[in-house]
Amino acid sequence: MTKEQIIEAVKNMTVLELNDLVKAIEEEFGVTAAAPVVVAGGAAAGAAAEEKTEFDVILADGGAQKIKVIKVVRELTGLGLKEAKDLVDNTPKPVKEGVSKEEAEEIKAKLEEAGAKVEIK
C-alpha cells in the first residue's frame, strides 16, 4: 500500500472511523495525538517575574562642579549639607536605594545635569 493509497483511504473515512484509527495508532505505537503544550508562554512569564523592579542609584563621581552636585543630592535625599558633601566627596556611594526604574532614571538625569557620573544597579 502506497502513501497515496493511505491518504485516499483516510479521506473516505467518517469522523468516527478516524477517531478509532487515531486510538489504534496511539495504542500500537505508544504515542499520543494530543497537541503539544507550548512552554514558551510559561518561560516568558518567568522571565518577566525575574525582571528587576527596584534599583539603586550610585554616585560614581561627583564631577568638576561638586557644589551643584551637592545641592542636587540634598534636594533628592533630604540630607544635611555636611552629609551630602561627604557623600559626593567619597564616591562611589549610593544616593538612593530600592527605587523604581522611572525614579532612578529621573535621579540619574538630575545628577548628570549637575555634572556627576551616575550608575543604576
Swiss-Prot record:
- Record field: transmembrane: none
Q: CDD domains from the entry?
A: Ribosomal_L7_L12 (cd00387)
Q: In the UniProt record, does the keyword Ribonucleoprotein occur?
A: yes
Name the keywords, alphabetized: Ribonucleoprotein, Ribosomal protein
Q: Which GO terms describe its molecular function?
A: mRNA binding; structural constituent of ribosome
Its subunit composition reads: Homodimer. Part of the ribosomal stalk of the 50S ribosomal subunit. Forms a multimeric L10(L12)X complex, where L10 forms an elongated spine to which 2 to 4 L12 dimers bind in a sequential fashion. Binds GTP-bound translation factors.
Question: What role does it play?
Answer: Forms part of the ribosomal stalk which helps the ribosome interact with GTP-bound translation factors. Is thus essential for accurate translation.
Similarity comment = Belongs to the bacterial ribosomal protein bL12 family.
Protein's name according to its UniProt entry: Large ribosomal subunit protein bL12
Q: What is the lineage of its organism?
A: Bacteria, Bacillati, Bacillota, Bacilli, Bacillales
